A protein has these predicted regions:
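A conserved hydrophobic secondary-structure block that centers on an alpha-helix together
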Residues: 10, 15-22
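Substrate-binding/catalytic cleft of secreted carbohydrate-active enzymes
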Residues: 20-222
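N-terminal carbohydrate-binding accessory modules
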Residues: 1-13, 34
C-alpha cells in the first residue's frame, strides 16, 4: 500500500460519510495517522490480537472470563501495547484505545485497562471491543452480524456497536481466491449491496434514541 493508496482510502471513507475509523487489530505507518489528523478523521486504535482464543462471553454483563497467559506472553503484550501507544499518542486523531478485540487472548482486563488509562488519561479506553466485559474503562462495546443489534446497556459508560455489517460483493478481477468470498452476507451486484447497507444504517437510528453512542461498519475492504 503506497502513501497515495493510504490517503485515497481515508478520503474515500470521508466522502462516504464516515467520521471515524477503527484501526482493527493492526497498526498503520505513522504517515497514515498524519493523514487522519489532516483530514479530520477520528481513530480507534486496536492492539493486534495475540495468544490463543479465549472463552467468548460477549453477552455476559461484567462477568467475562480472563485467559491465563504465560508471563512471557503477558510481558510481550505490555511492551508492544506501550510501543503502539507511544507511536500514536502524538496524533490528535487517535481518540480511543482498544486493548482487546472480542476475547482473543484477553487477560488481566482490569489491570491492562487501568494501566492504559493511567498512561494516557487524555483519551477514552474501550476495554474489549465485542469481548468479555469487565467493570472497567469508559465503554461497553458489542458486536453483531450482519445487522445491528445491542443486547446490553451500561448506564455508567459509553455504549457502542463495535462491529456490524460484513456485506460481501465478489468482484471479478479482484478475487485472491475464487472459491470463497469474504462476508457474512453476500450479493451479486453493487445495487444489492447498497440496499442492504442502507437498511442496516437506517436501523441504527433507533439505538441512538435508546442512548447508544456509536457504530462501526465492518468493513470497507476484504
Amino acid at each position: 500500500r503506497t502513501a497515495e493508496a493510504l490517503l485515497f482510502e481515508l478520503v474515500k471513507a470521508k466522502e462516504l460519510g464516515y467520521n471515524m475509523i477503527r484501526e482493527h487489530v493492526k497498526v498503520e505507518p505513522a504517515g497514515w495517522y498524519y493523514h487522519c489528523d489532516r483530514e479530520g478523521i477520528l481513530v480507534w486504535q486496536d492492539m493486534p490480537s495475540g495468544d490463543m482464543g479465549n472463552k467468548w462471553e460477549m453477552h455476559t454483563y461484567n462477568g467475562g472470563t480472563d485467559k491465563n497467559r504465560t508471563q512471557e506472553s503477558k510481558d510481550n503484550f505490555s511492551k508492544e501495547w506501550k510501543e503502539i501507544m507511544d507511536l500514536c499518542m502524538p496524533s490528535p486523531s487517535v481518540v480511543v484505545w482498544v486493548p482487546f478485540n472480542e476475547a482473543w487472548g484477553q487477560f488481566d482486563t482490569e489491570r491492562i485497562v487501568n494501566w492504559t488509562m493511567e498512561y494516557d488519561p487524555s483519551r477514552l479506553v474501550n476495554p474489549a471491543s465485542g469481548g468479555n466485559h469487565r467493570p472497567c474503562g469508559h465503554m461497553l462495546d458489542l458486536h453483531n452480524y450482519p445487522g445491528p443489534a445491542m443486547k446490553l446497556f451500561d448506564p455508567q459508560r459509553v455504549n457502542v456497536l463495535g462491529e456490524y455489517g460484513g456485506i460481501g460483493l465478489p468482484m471479478e478481477g479482484h478475487l485472491w481466491w475464487n472459491k470463497r468470498n469474504w462476508g457474512y452476507v453476500q450479493f451479486k451486484t453493487p445495487e444489492e449491496v447498497t440496499a442492504e447497507y442502507e437498511k442496516y444504517a437506517k436501523s441504527l437510528i433507533k439505538y441512538v434514541r435508546l442512548g447508544f453512542s456509536g457504530a462501526v461498519y465492518t468493513q470497507t475492504t476484504d
